[in-house]
């Protein structure tokens, strides 16, 4: 029997930690760490809402730290803890509904209802995550939002899902 070597959350953790590690290799700055944290907010939220809520205030205090390497080491450990919680349909649903709120001013009530139905269908296990993600990405292309476009959530999950379904993993 062909067993999966990594689950999807483990692959996300590998990608996320690799990117964080590269920040340090390329010259660590407060701005780079804040940008990283901002790009990964939805990924973090999908993995652990409680850890996400703890990490936010920690990051907000980055300017209090004299030694950026010490901050980085603490942050890295906290990200490891956060990402050790596997993402689950409940938390993905929360993320998708959060994103739906960003799109609300741009999509009409029929589109909102259709998106809500796709999200709910995913929540009930009737659709894969990729279905509501692709609809959201479609709306993001029609109604660009800089913050949403920068979210790694919309790159990493489809990449992992596609790798899984292509037989690479």
Identify the function of each model-found stretch.
Residues 2-169:
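Acidic, Ser/Pro/Thr-rich low-complexity regulatory regions
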